[in-house]
């Protein structure tokens, strides 16, 4: 009986810790990726292909992405609009 109560308490405590502190605090070896590469960035605003992703024209998507990714970025089509997408470096 006591053993069942102890196991129940340990499981309950683990669930509470997961909810309160989140997974990144429970498993600190799993880091949060702060890289802008391989991601879309709608915050950059409207992306015009051939203009905003052109390195020679100093396009805003290209400028945003080249700061954190060595291969820059391009305007990627999502549904009916283009969004700035930074290329995957490597």
Swiss-Prot record:
Protein name stated in the entry: Putative defensin-like protein 20
Family: Belongs to the DEFL family.
Disulfide bonds, paired cysteine numbers: 37-88, 47-75, 61-84, 65-86
GO cellular component: extracellular region
GO biological process, one term: killing of cells of another organism
Keyword Secreted: yes
Main location: secreted
Pfam families linked: Defensin_like
Keywords for the protein's UniProt record, in alphabetical order: Antimicrobial, Disulfide bond, Fungicide, Plant defense, Secreted, Signal
Entries under InterPro entries matching the protein: Defensin-like_20-28
Record localization: Secreted
Cleaved signal peptide residues: 1-22
Keyword Disulfide bond found: yes
């Amino acid at each position: 009986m006591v053993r069942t109560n102890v196991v129940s308490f340990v499981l309950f405590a683990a669930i509470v810790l997961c909810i309160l502190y989140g997974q990144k605090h429970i498993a600190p070896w799993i880091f949060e990726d702060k890289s802008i590469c391989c991601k879309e960035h709608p915050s950059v605003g409207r992306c015009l292909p051939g203009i905003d992703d052109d390195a020679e024209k100093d396009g805003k998507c290209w400028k945003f992405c080249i700061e954190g990714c060595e291969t820059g970025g391009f305007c990627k089509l999502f549904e009916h609009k283009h969004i700035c997408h930074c290329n995957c470096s490597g």
